[in-house]
Amino acid sequence: MQTITILALIACVAVPIFADFDHLRARRDVVESSGEGSGESSGEKPVVESSGEGSGESSGDKEAVEASGEGSGEGSGDATLESSGEGSGESHNAVVASDSPKDVKALTANEFAVSV
């Protein structure tokens, strides 16, 4: 009887702890890439969209990153970073990496807009 009680107490404590481990579940990231066109996506996981010419829109509860060569984009969610060919963006967490490993530097959105 005591063994059953102890196992029941352990189960009551362990189940809520393991239910909070989201990183153990399969991730549902969405990655979309195209040469020309537009795309739209929404969900609760990170969304990354890239296009050469066109526009895109994403919305969700997690972070959204959007970049385009010539076009426009809109995003809404908890964390949104938007940039276009003209160099506009509204985020202070942008990271830009170059091809040469010696010149890798993290830029804010304002520094990125000036450098473009």
From Swiss-Prot:
Keyword set, alphabetical order: Glycoprotein, Proteoglycan, Signal
The keyword Signal is annotated on this UniProt entry: yes
Residue spans of biased composition, Low complexity class: 32-41, 48-58
Region (Disordered): 29-102
Keyword Cytoplasm carried by entry: no
UniProt signal peptide: 1-19
Glycosites: 68, 72, 76, 84, 88
Protein name: Chondroitin proteoglycan 7
Gene of this entry: cpg-7
